[in-house]
Amino acid sequence: MEQVNELKEKGNKALSAGNIDDALQCYSEAIKLDPQNHVLYSNRSAAYAKKGDYQKAYEDGCKTVDLKPDWGKGYSRKAAALEFLNRFEEAKQTYEEGLKHEANNPQLKEGLQNMEARLAERKFMNPFNMPNLYQKLESDPRTKTLLADPTYRELIEQLRNKPSDLGTKLQDPRIMTTLSVLLGVDLGSMDEEEEVATPPPPPPPKKETKPEPMEEDLPENKKQALREKELGNEAYKKKDFDTALKHYDKAKDLDPTNMTYITNQAAVYFEKGDYGQCRELCEKAIEVGRENREDYRQIAKAYARIGNSYFKEEKYKDAIHFYNKSLAEHRTPDVLKKCQQAEKILKEQERLAYINPDLALEEKNKGNECFQKGDYPQAMKHYTEAIKRNPKDAKLYSNRAACYTKLLEFQLALKDCEECIQLEPTFIKGYTRKAAALEAMKDYTKAMDVYQKALDLDSNCKEAADGYQRCVMAQYNRHDSPEDVKRRAMADPEVQQIMSDPAMRLILEQMQKDPQALSEHLKNPVIAQKIQKLMDVGLIAIR
């Protein structure tokens, strides 16, 4: 086991120094000695990814997940490899699977957000550039009539030449119709799972269903039941709940197969604040509805009302359960929004209930012990648990940042340092650990800035002074060739993602041909951020 740890540490140092082949050899030798060690496969996956051998990185990521299915890092490795292989949908699914095991893993959360953004970009690539554009518009009756309007043609040409204007034109119903034709989808139904309600699409052609019976076709008992229901509705609107209940009760007796009269009674008890009786009636209504093959939308309403009753009582777990039952019957934006609201409240309640500074201290001490032994993955787990128990303790983020740095996860180390500094701006370790991570990434300019901030707080801080001096010397002795700059930059996953984005490649080519285009692109904050990143790593320069 000692030999395995030595090989692993040797591999980590080689990978940090950019000696990828040496790192791969060390990890492979360690795996031969300990083939069930998931951390070794995870590290080798990272090395293969840096080398550009994404298929092998993916295979090692899969092996990591197989050996340790509850470890978020394994899913992160596997998903990252899938990203590089341009298998975005699979990458998204892998991030989602990882979050089932580690719901608060920041790397998985960020990865999932990036994948959703990438998939959204793919989904809405400029369709106005297709070669047979007008032929397609002519062949569809929805757009054929629009082509007679010169302003419509002008609009199409504008979007063809400047697709960035599409976002400002989506309010125009002609554009939504055009997109439906060009993309071959009904955009009215695409947002079914969005939180916010959207205007419903045009009704589809009616199916051959039995027509709703008119009152004159109904049996006498059903007619009387409807009249009682109307009287009940009038009383309900006037807040005369006792009278409303009497009429709904008569309607139910006249037509016992109709669940609506029972759900109306439940609505009255809901307004009266008798939530137990409301739920009992809703359950009874669902039973009657099932027996008589009632419309699933009515069943969904009954479940939603049960959910609302629990929400009123602040029993959010029960509310979520019944909201989901309602959504399984029939999905509506209002119920979805209410369910998400309950989930958000419950999550916050659970987070606050979990806070315990004494247990946080215990976990911190366990983390310190593991860190001293060199078991950084286990130390990180203890620090993460400590943070959940006491999220306002800046030192915990600093300790976890030290773990991330040891595990070569410099971006995550930087995030924890930022959180540490935000919580306690005068805590020196937050600055020195952030600077150390930047130094390890060979970003000497930024590292010097952070070391200087530490010295501003404490001019006698030897760690900051030594670090600053190291960065000055490293910067002075640096004679990187363009190839070295590119190799180091491409080892950064964020840079890899930017450079593999077809849209960004197009923008960079356009900037080379037409430098004036830069100012236009910089108006988009997302693109500006990506360009700034490429400038920071030295891949591009603007004069």
Swiss-Prot record:
The modification N-acetylmethionine is found at residue 1. It is found in: Cytoplasm; Nucleus; Dynein axonemal particle. It comes from the Eukaryota. The modification N6-acetyllysine is found at residues 8, 301, 312, 325, 344, 446. A motif (Bipartite nuclear localization signal) lies at residues 222-239. The keyword Ubl conjugation applies. Keywords: Acetylation, Cytoplasm, Isopeptide bond, Nucleus, Phosphoprotein, Repeat, TPR repeat, Ubl conjugation. Residues 130-169, 492-531 form the STI1 domain. GO terms for cellular component: dynein axonemal particle; nucleus. InterPro entries: STI1/HOP_DP, STI1_HS-bd, TPR-like_helical_dom_sf, TPR_rpt. Pfam families: STI1-HOP_DP (PF17830), TPR_11 (PF13414), TPR_12 (PF13424), TPR_8 (PF13181). Its main location: cytoplasm. Probably forms a complex composed of chaperones HSP90 and HSP70, co-chaperones STIP1/HOP, CDC37, PPP5C, PTGES3/p23, TSC1 and client protein TSC2. Forms a complex with HSPA8/HSC70, HSPCA/HSP-86 and HSPCB/HSP-84. Interacts with PACRG. Interacts with EEF1AKMT3. Interacts with HSP90/HSP90AA1; the interaction dissociates the PPP5C:HSP90AA1 interaction. Interacts with FLCN, FNIP1 and FNIP2. Interacts with HSPA8/HSC70. Interacts with HSP90AB1; upon SMYD2-dependent HSP90AB1 methylation. The TPR 1 repeat interacts with the C-terminal of HSC70. The TPR 4, 5 and 6 repeats (also called TPR2A domain) and TPR 7, 8 and 9 repeats (also called TPR2B domain) interact with HSP90. Acts as a co-chaperone for HSP90AA1. Mediates the association of the molecular chaperones HSPA8/HSC70 and HSP90. This is Stress-induced-phosphoprotein 1. The gene is STIP1.
